[in-house]
């Protein structure tokens, strides 16, 4: 349920523990306990945003700019998304998109 709410609200950059607890009808302490193994609420939200960005980048019909994608998944800017993506996945979004398209084309 927490993941579903985050996924629906990805573009909302004000999404935080308080609003997530309200939307999921969980107490803040319960929510924080649930996501503690993932580094806390903020880290969990960022991970969901990064996974959404990775999914979109892997799609062969993806044509949005990095700035548009950043906005869609709740990052403040393309550079913020790019840095977070590199930190999390070990490659830049453009590198990932190229690799995903090359891999998809080899089947």
Language-model region placement:
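Sequence-specific DNA-binding recognition helix
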Residues: 61-99
